[in-house]
Amino acid sequence: MMIHAYSEDYLNNAQKILGDMMDYAVNTYEFPPNQFYEMFLVSDVSMQFQTGNPTYVAGKTGCELVKEVIRKSGLLIPELEDEMYLDKSPEYWCGWALAYYQWYTGRSFMKIYHAVSIEEILNMYPVYHEMDISRFVETINEKWDQYLSLIHISEPTRLQLI
């Protein structure tokens, strides 16, 4: 049985928060998706989220996370009004699905990003957004396995170095 960083009771809210974060960052602040996500990764916001800090998975909005990531990145950008969109964008789905995958697997957001970029996840939207989330998990797990096989091939083992 997998032990998750936080209770499944928080999962739905956490998915909405990460979805709103990606949506707001891309569609209001107009960050390119990969650029903002990389800022998220190097801030401690990603660590707080993936370890299940209740402030991040239940207590803040996606808009608040975006503003915190911007602040922690050292960018001096005027704060924009909080916007939550009724129509859910591909960026929203990307964050929503990614939050589920991270929670389900326990892998860090950074490790996931090494295996699959945000652009790749966004490209999955037309086909996967209507499917059960388990199909998304299967596909990202396949990409994870491909990534692992590549790094194991490209890095010599200790025995090979002797």
Report residues per predicted region.
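Single conserved hydrophobic/aromatic residue that forms the stacking wall/gate
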Residues: 151-162
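A charged, amphipathic interaction segment
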Residues: 84-146
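C-terminal alpha-helical interaction appendages
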Residues: 2-103
